[in-house]
Amino acid sequence: AVAESLTNIVWAPLAQGLDSVSLSANWMWPCRSQEGEDARLYEGVKALSDFCCDLHINVPTGKDSLSMTQQYPDGEKVISPGTVIVSAGGEVNDVRKVVRPVVVNEPNSKIYHLDFSSLAPQLGGSAFAQTLGYVGSDVPTVADAAYFRSAFAAVQVMVQEGLLLAGHDISAGGLI
C-alpha cells in the first residue's frame, strides 16, 4: 500500500522529492470479531512502519476501523478482510509539470517499464494479467527500500526536467 501510494505521487514534481511526502494510513481490520486479528494487525502496522522508516518518510496521521463486521437480519455475518489504505501528500513546486497518465502519440517515443522493486517482474492481480485470463499469485512487492528510494528519485529528476510524456504506476496494470 505504501509503494502504491508513492508510485501514484511520483508523477508530480515534489519540492524535495520523497522527503516532501507524508502518508496517512487507514486501517480497516476485523479485530473485534476474529481471534488472532489483533496480532495480524500489529504485524501489518509494524511492517508498514519499518518500511516507512527505511524510506525516511513519516506517517503522521491515520485512522482505524476495527469492527468490520456486518450482521444481517437472517443471522448471516460477513467479516471483512484486514486492509490498509495509504494516501500520500506532498508539496508540489510546479503543478504545470505534473505528468499525466495518458499515452501521447509522439513519433519516435518509447514506452519503458521502470522497476521500483529490483525483483523479477510480477503481475499477479494486475488488470493486465486479468486481460490475459491470468490472475496469478506472484504480486509486485518491494524488497529493498534503498532501491525504491533511488528509483523514485530518478523519476523525480525526469519529471522536474520535463523528460516524460506520460506515466502511470503498474499496480493497476499500467506502465511506468
List the model feature ranges, each with a label.
Residues 1-176:
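Glycine/proline-enriched, intrinsically flexible loops and inter-domain linkers
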